[in-house]
Amino acid sequence: MEKRGGGSSGGSGSSAEAEVRKGPWTMEEDLILINYIANHGDGVWNSLAKSAGLKRTGKSCRLRWLNYLRPDVRRGNITPEEQLIIMELHAKWGNRWSKIAKHLPGRTDNEIKNFWRTRIQKYIKQSDVTTTSSVGSHHSSEINDQAASTSSHNVFCTQDQAMETYSPTPTSYQHTNMEFNYGNYSAAAVTATVDYPVPMTVDDQTGENYWGMDDIWSSMHLLNGN
């Protein structure tokens, strides 16, 4: 009997753990969390999750609220002006996303980090490969032309003259603060290229559902019987 009782206790614990939901949040869960915080405020997140009737961890509730559901979280595409600020501050501070987010009201550090990695950084890497290949081909052509010219006209260049015809291969993304330039990539060129719409349904990195606020508030009225 004692042995069976011990097994029952373990099974209960496993059952409780299995009830914790993982994966993307549903709109129903979002509405429950928004409604609860609107009426009771936030607080100890583990207690809040249980009190609200959500089968989520306190950490999951906290991150969902802070990164997606807070009323002051700014929605919609990152603007060209915001892109310039992100590039300027990243050139100064690197991957200090929380510090950068303080200069972009309504944007979260997670959103800025995802935008940087999936938009700006991706563009810089792709451009670097293209530019390096193009410049390398151009230099090879110059060298061949110079060799042919020297052979035909019996012209001998001094070492100093040869150095003057050589320009080093550009490097991408150097931490400079000159007119927002990243090595050979101006902010204007990058922002013009990476002005893609930010998904309003699924987050690129986390896979979380991302609702429009109009959808959420219209559903809130239905939930509250208004």
Curated annotation (Swiss-Prot):
Organism, by scientific name, is Arabidopsis thaliana
Q: Which residues form the signal peptide?
A: none
* First-listed, main subcellular location of the protein, grouped into a coarse class: nucleus
- Region (Disordered) residue ranges read 1-20
Q: What is the official name of this protein in its record?
A: Transcription factor MYB21
- Keywords carried by this UniProt record: Activator, DNA-binding, Nucleus, Phytochrome signaling pathway, Repeat, Transcription, Transcription regulation, Ubl conjugation
Q: Please give the biological process terms from Gene Ontology that the record holds.
A: gibberellic acid mediated signaling pathway; jasmonic acid mediated signaling pathway; red, far-red light phototransduction; response to jasmonic acid; stamen development; stamen filament development
Q: Which residues bind DNA?
A: 45-69, 97-120
Q: Which residue intervals define the domain HTH myb-type in the entry?
A: 17-69, 70-124
What is its quaternary makeup?
A: Interacts (via N-terminus) with TIFY10A/JAZ1, TIFY5A/JAZ8 AND TIFY3A/JAZ11.
